[in-house]
Amino acid sequence: MAAMNNMNPMWVPEGYESPLNIRETEVAIKCVKDFFEKELARQLNLTRVSAPFFVYPESGLNDTLNGVERPVHFGVKEQGDREVEIVHSLAKWKRFALKRYGFKHGEGLYADMYAIRRDEDTDHLHSILVDQWDWERIIYKEERNEETLRNIVKKVYKALKNTEKYMAIQYEYIEELLPSEISFMTTQELLDMYPDLTPKEREREIVREKGAVFLMKIGGALGSGEIHDGRAPDYDDWELNGDILVYYPLLDTAFELSSMGIRVDEEALTHQLEVRGCPERKDLMFHKALLNGELPYTIGGGIGQARICMFYLRKAHIGEVIASVWPDKVAETLEGRGVHLL
């Protein structure tokens, strides 16, 4: 099958036709989400909590992503037009919530997170509207190591694997694609294997071979001086994080289902802020609390709801499982090629 053309958002696999119409797709989306949410909570000992849709900029709680994406913001009338920002993710908010809500070691929370990423370049896998399960769990400081990370990754992967088994029972056309176990590899090891390829090309090559990979150590500079992918400096520890990538044969591409990691401690936060050239963030509320030792040590991540629905339902475009907006020409062309956007 031809590889997905990342330069052409209107490309559709030849002969593609989803077995489900729009109404059947909506039912199947609920089926996926209900099962996976319970399975994730069971594997990681998580309690569902309500999530904010916007936060105050000065709190430092919003996710700055790669540092260039502009948050959507507006003024609140009753507060004299005090500005709030729609969240990009709940990566930092969750650590505050764990402390405030009285969670203990080995316990965690998850929330349904909705975000607007206005500067996203949309394609088959990316939309302006983002929905994900944001989760976070308390660990001891001495558990901030690769062994802990690997153990939690295996639990998340088990939830993903069990969900695929469940959906294969519910729908005859769904066959199991995920391997029984996930492989682990660092970004430096991947660069050494494929030094002449781009980061995204490297990811595709390794998941073609392995089926499912947890790609570790994302955000810091590699031996070549390049960064595999951008990460904000103030939630993941770049030495103890990664992405769950799986192979998606319909699009012949690496498919990111989750980004997760052990969160920064005082030392990692200070170092990473210096590397990114933004030490002034230490004066924000979140960063002050962390540096003062007031927040728990945690591991956490985000799992794309539309992403896993697209993957399990074997859809060609994320717009088939999330109601977002698309350029007129893209929407019209996709509709004419059998891709029915919500």
Q: Where do the protein language model's features map onto the residues?
A:
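A general structural signal for short secondary-structure junctions and capping/turn motifs
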Residues: F74-K77, K99-H105, L125-S127, E175, ...
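Class II aminoacyl-tRNA synthetase-like tRNA-binding/catalytic domains
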Residues: A2-H126, D134-I138
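Extended, charged alpha-beta segments that form solvent-exposed binding/catalytic grooves
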Residues: A111-L197, E201
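N-terminal pre-domains immediately preceding structured catalytic cores
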Residues: E58-D63, L177-M185, P327
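A translation/RNA-centric and nucleic-acid-associated enzymatic feature enriched
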Residues: Y114-I116, T187-L342
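A generic secondary-structure signal for well-formed alpha-helical elements
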Residues: L40-T47, V156-M167, A316
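Generic recognition of stable, solvent-exposed alpha-helical segments in well-folded globular domains
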Residues: V27, C31, F35, E147-N151, ...
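Extracellular structured ligand-interaction cores
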Residues: E107-L109, V130-D134, K210-A212, D252-A254
